[in-house]
Design a protein with these regions (language model features):
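Acidic-glycine-rich active-site phosphate/pyrophosphate-binding loop
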Residues: 21-30, 81-94, 142-162, 217, ...
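Condensing-enzyme catalytic core mediating Claisen C-C bond formation in acyl metabolism
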Residues: 1-42, 162-241, 252, 346-348
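Short beta-strand segments
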Residues: 1-4, 74, 104, 129-135, ...
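Membrane helical hairpin/interfacial module
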Residues: 61, 65-77
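Short acidic, glycine/serine/threonine-rich loops at helix termini
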Residues: 11-12, 82-84, 140-145, 340-344
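Flexible, glycine-rich active-site loops centered on histidine and acidic residues
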Residues: 118-176
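Claisen-condensing/thiolase-fold acyl-transfer catalytic domains that form or cleave C-C bonds
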Residues: 47, 51-54, 58, 77-78, ...
Length: 348
C-alpha cells in the first residue's frame, strides 16, 4: 500500500474565526477539539486536492499511473453537480481510460471505497486500485465576502454585521470542517495480509442527523434564492443525537467485524476512527477499552475533512512509524445517511 495526502496552504485558526462570528477558541476546542483547519482558495476544488493526493500515493507506492485499473473517489463536495469528480480526477492524474467511479457516503465515503476496491481486487475485476477521499468544504462555509477577506488577511475589519450574525447562527457545524484529501494504492496480495474483514451499514431513517435539505431535484427549480435565504443549502445538524449514535455505532462495528474473523479488541494495534469530533473519537476509544495511543486523533490540526479523515490520519500514522508489518488496523467511520461500518487491515 502507498499513501498520500494533499492539503491547502491556507490555515484558519480559531482566533481567525473569532473575527467573523461570535465564538472563542475555548468554545470551539471544548466542544470539538478543533484548533485550526485549512480552506481551499477560490478556484481550487476537491478534484485538484484528490489528484494531488492520488499522485502522491502512487509515488509512495512506486506505481505508475498506467498500472492503475480502478479509481474510487469519495466526496460530498464535488467541483460541479455533473459529472462527478471521479472522471475529472482520472484525467488530471493521467490514468488510462479505466473504471473510475464516485461514491457519496459522506464521512463514511473512504471506508465504503476501501470495501468496494477490496471486493473488486478479490474477484479479479481489478489488479491495482486507488481509493481517494477529498473535500473542499470552503464552498459552503457560511461566510460572506467581507468575512472571507478577513480570513484571508486582505481586509482588517470591521466585520459586516449581517455576515457576522449569519456565521454565528451556523457556528455549531461550521467550526468543525476543513479541506483536504487522502489516497491509498491497493493491490491484491497472495498471503493473509490486506483487508481481512469488513462490515458496512446504512439507516436512512437517520438521514436528518446531518443533511443539506436544499439543492435537490424534487424541487422545481432545484435551486433558487429562497432556498439560499432560508439556509437550506448548508448543513443542518442534530449534534447531540449524532454524537449518541456515532459513539454506539463505531465501537459496535469494530467489535462485530473482529468477532466475524475470530479476533478481539486486544489484537488491535491501531484504530483509525473518523475525525468527526475529538469527544467522539475519545468515546470510541473508551467504549473499546483502548488507550488513546491506539485510537489517535488529528482533528485539532485538520478539523473534520469528512471523506478524507481516515486516509489523512492513516498516512500520518505511517509516517510516525505506527504501521509496521503485521500490525492489525481497524478503520471505522460514521456519517450522514446514516452510513457507518468498520474494516480490518493486516499490514503486509
Amino acid at each position: 500500500m502507498g499513501t498520500g495526502v494533499a492539503q491547502p496552504p491556507h490555515v484558519v485558526s480559531n482566533a481567525d474565526l473569532v473575527k467573523v462570528m461570535d465564538t472563542s477558541d475555548e468554545w470551539i476546542q471544548s466542544r470539538t477539539g478543533v484548533a485550526r483547519r485549512r480552506y481551499v482558495a477560490p478556484g481550487v476544488g476537491s478534484v485538484q486536492l484528490a489528484a494531488e493526493a492520488v499522485s502522491a500515493a502512487l509515488n509512495d507506492a512506486g506505481v505508475a499511473p498506467g498500472e492503475v485499473d480502478l479509481l474510487v473517489n469519495a466526496t460530498m463536495t464535488p467541483d460541479m453537480f455533473a459529472p462527478g469528480n471521479a472522471a475529472l480526477v482520472q484525467a488530471e492524474v493521467g490514468l488510462e481510460r479505466i473504471c473510475a467511479f464516485e461514491i457519496r457516503q459522506q464521512c463514511s465515503g473512504f471506508l465504503y471505497g476501501l470495501e468496494l476496491a477490496d471486493a473488486m481486487l478479490a474477484n479479479g475485476r481489478a489488479t491495482t486500485a486507488v481509493v481517494v477521499g477529498a473535500e473542499a468544504h470552503a464552498g459552503y462555509m457560511p461566510f460572506g465576502p467581507t468575512s472571507w477577506a478577513m480570513l484571508r488577511g486582505t481586509h482588517d475589519g470591521p466585520a459586516d454585521p449581517d455576515e457576522y450574525a449569519a456565521a454565528t447562527d451556523s457556528r455549531a457545524w461550521s467550526v468543525l470542517f476543513g479541506d483536504g484529501a487522502g489516497a491509498c494504492v491497493l493491490r491484491r496480495g497472495e498471503d493473509d495480509s490486506g483487508f481481512i474483514g469488513g462490515r458496512l451499514f446504512s439507516d436512512g431513517g437517520s438521514y436528518d442527523l446531518i443533511h443539506v435539505p436544499g439543492i435537490g431535484f424534487s424541487r422545481q427549480p432545484y435551486i433558487d434564492a429562497a432556498q439560499l435565504e432560508a439556509g437550506l443549502c448548508i448543513p443542518q445538524m442534530k449534534g447531540m443525537e449524532l454524537f449518541r449514535q456515532a459513539v454506539r455505532a463505531m465501537p459496535s462495528a469494530v467489535t462485530g467485524v473482529l468477532d466475524s474473523v475470530g479476533l478481539s479488541v486486544s489484537d488491535l494495534d491501531l484504530v483509525i476512527a473518523h475525525q468527526a469530533n475529538a469527544r467522539i473519537v475519545s468515546a470510541v476509544g473508551t467504549a473499546l477499552g483502548l488507550d488513546e495511543s491506539v485510537v489517535p486523533s488529528n482533528i485539532a490540526e485538520h478539523g473534520n475533512t469528512t471523506a478524507a479523515t481516515l486516509p489523512i490520519l492513516f498516512h500520518e500514522q505511517r509516517l510516525a512509524g505506527r504501521v509496521g508489518s503485521g500490525a492489525l488496523v481497524a478503520f471505522t467511520a460514521f456519517g450522514a445517511g446514516a452510513h457507518w461500518g468498520a474494516s480490518l487491515y493486516r499490514v503486509p
